Design a protein with these regions (language model features):
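Short internal beta-strands
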Residues: 45-56, 79, 181, 248
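Short glycine-rich anion-binding loops that position phosphate/pyrophosphate groups of nucleotides
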Residues: 22-24, 118-121, 230-231
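Short glycine-rich or small-residue beta-strand-to-loop segments that form or flank ligand, phosphate
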Residues: 14-25, 49-55, 225-227
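Histidine-anchored nucleotide/phosphate-binding helix
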Residues: 24-43, 240-248
Length: 248
């Protein structure tokens, strides 16, 4: 979508960094799919790094290489960003608001960064997705700390929000272009996958998200009853709280 074929964006010898958002459903399957394309276009496994943003809440780190062939799995690096390690950060640029932006070196040094992430409603950002897996999750402790706050109850998801504007500016400054945007379905399923230029893919995924996960009503309900049709395996109270927050 609004971007040349991946075949035209990469050549043998390029260093490729796959940034995978922690909330992405079927992430291992998506990593396998992206790798199969990269391999077909001559990219070496040892030139590929899978980079996971820092965790704001406690949780495990599944091996996103699990579905890759054994030989490939051993060659592709899997790293979780540590914002406390200042040596892992590099200076990107200064925003129009005077904010100095630091990002993970593996991301900055990549010839081709590819973003794989879920799109969803977010009380602070409006919509999670696009570059929100990169900033602040692949930045400094200070950047992550500044991003944590209460949602904007007075704003609708499509309204302008300061952090969303910051995220979009950071993505523009680093020149990131290629993204795989995922709209979640029930459970760990996938409703839609949009691949292409990051802004176009994000906007199209947001449109599908609204069509799939919103239910217009004539009046505000006084009570909502929610049924959970499966156990809590893979879920946490953080996700429950986030769902309640965006539903306010």
């Amino acid at each position: 979508l609004n971007y040349p074929s991946l075949r035209q964006a990469v050549v043998p010898g390029d260093r490729v960094t796959l940034v995978v958002d922690r909330q992405t459903p079927q992430a291992e399957t998506l990593v396998l799919g992206v790798w199969s394309k990269l391999e077909a276009y001559g990219v070496n496994a040892e030139d590929v790094t899978i980079l996971v943003p820092a965790a704001i809440t406690p949780g495990g780190n599944p091996d996103l290489r699990r579905l890759l062939p054994a030989g490939v799995r051993e060659q592709i690096a899997l790293k979780t960003h540590d914002p406390t390690d200042e040596k892992s950060l590099g200076y990107l640029a200064t925003t129009t608001g005077g904010e100095r932006i630091y990002l993970n070196q593996d991301l900055l040094n990549a010839d081709l960064p590819i973003l794989i992430g879920a799109v969803g409603f977010d009380s602070v950002l409006g919509y999670r997705g696009g570059g929100s897996a990169i900033y602040p999750g692949l930045s400094s402790v200070e950047a992550i700390r500044k991003s944590i706050g209460q949602g904007h109850e007075e704003l609708a998801p499509d309204d302008a929000r300061p952090l969303r504007q910051m995220v979009d500016e950071v993505i523009w400054l680093m020149g990131l272009q290629y993204a795989v945007q995922v709209v979640p379905a029930v459970g760990d399923g996938v409703s839609e996958i949009v691949v292409g230029q990051v802004d176009a893919a994000f906007q199209k995924a947001c449109t599908h998200l609204k069509e799939t996960w919103t239910q217009p009503t004539d009046a505000r309900s006084g009570m909502v009853i929610v049924a959970v049709d499966q156990d809590a395996n893979g879920h946490s109270w953080f996700q429950v709280g986030a769902a309640l927050d965006v539903a306010r």
